[in-house]
Structures are given as C-alpha cells and as structure tokens.
Amino acid sequence: AHTGPTTGIIEGLAGSAASLAVMACDTIKAYATSKFHPHYSLCIAMGHKADIADTLLMMEKLDADLEQLYATRTGNSVEVTKSHLIGPHGDGTHFTAAEAKAAGYVDEVIQITGKTPQGSKPKNSVSADRLRMWKRALTR
C-alpha cells in the first residue's frame, strides 16, 4: 500500500462511486469546470422477497457508511451530509467545483489558464499542426 500523501484530481465528473473513491485522498483538487455528485446508493434488485429484503438491508448499511464517511471528510454534520446525499430532487446534489469546495468536499479549485498544470507538457501530447488538421477534417 502507498504510505505517502495522496492527491486526487477531479478532471470532469466525480459522481457516484467516483465521488466516494476520491474521499480516500489526503488532498482533493478539482478543475473549475469539474462537477461533484454524491448521492445515496443505487441498485437494481431481482429475486424473491428475501432477496429484496437482503438487498435493502445492505443498501441501508452502505448509506449509513456514506453518511459517516462524507461527514468525516468534510467536517459537516451527518444531517448536512444527508441533505447533500438526498439533494433537491432526491438524486443527490450536483456541485460545481466551487460549490464542492464551499461544502468541504474539495480542498482546492484549479483555475483553467489554457496551460497544463505547472506549465508541464502532457505525456502523449498532440502537436498544434495535428490539432489543426483534425479541426479542419471535423468541420468540413
């Protein structure tokens, strides 16, 4: 197992299980255009009454764990966390990066400047000429 500090970077949408996975990181960063969507567990169940009852019991335990985990990570109360997991329409809350930071889910919002972070050149980068070629091909 990795023993050093970890940083999670949300580059798009961290919803559902992705919103849970990033909680394990020591520091969470999100690009300004990223979204964060925590919600209660979802499933499709099939079977007899006993199967459905077992599934419901498992989901209730999972939901209690989600409440505790998000509350612990954010410093919010369990009641506030429950309101985020329910959301305005019963399907969780869709946060912008800034809203997620204000709610304690994200530690830092990365502003988009047109350059890669720290001015580094990404691996597998595409040349400007290649991008222009694709743009011409796609706009014909």
Which role does the model predict for each range below?
Residues 1-20, 24-140:
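N-terminal organellar transit peptides
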